[in-house]
Amino acid sequence: MADKNCPICRGTGFVDKGNVVEICQCRFKEENFQRLLNIPKKFWSAELDNYQPISPAQRRALEVCKEFVFNFDPEEGKGITLVGPPQMGKTHLVVGILKALYRQKRIRGFFFDTKEMLFQLRFYAGSEEDKYSRLLRFLMRIPVLALDDLGSERLSDWSIEVLSLLITYRYNHQLSTLITTNYQLKKSEEELLASLEERLSPGVVGKLFHMNEVIYVS
């Protein structure tokens, strides 16, 4: 229910932003809302509207992310890959997309740091097969999955196999995946592809680049 004393929506539960109407934040219990999307506490305040771009590349990235939300069609399976060095606000943008999709279109996403996701899956695989299967199925089928810091280190064969299964399923079933990767900007997309393929696999990287628009942030 809306907070009748909310200064943002004035008790209506909705916020008119011109070309879009959002569900007001007061309708969500903030902690439950953030946990539903698995947003880390550090990014609970992150929104597309409070991202502060400095460079032209950051402004372009913000524009693309807002357009992505506005035009989002869950049947298309389109995604975004944000590429660039640390401290550029890539995670902020991805979190902002997840929140906006849920508020504006009631489409649930789920955020995971890639290393943390693989650690949890590996732990369950070795001790609790039922939890492993349930978590993997959930990640395969969630309408929007955000994988933060993908490809930042070399992965084991097991991790590559799990990522390949996850990405291939989402690719084949046209489910949107959002990616951030902390690579320095390469001279060309071919060099970026080669660098990622060293850590992942050509099949995984090929699908990611086919299904996602790649945005360079610097």
Can you say where each PLM-predicted feature lies in the sequence?
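Pre-Walker A adenine-sensing motif
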Residues: 63-74
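P-loop NTPase Walker A phosphate-binding motif
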Residues: 92-105
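Short glycine-rich substrate-engagement loop in P-loop NTPases that contacts/grips substrate
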Residues: 59-63, 102-141
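Walker A/P-loop nucleotide-binding motif
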Residues: 76-94
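Loop/turn-to-beta-strand initiation segments
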Residues: 107-108, 141-144, 173-179
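A short, basic N-terminal segment
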Residues: 1-60, 67
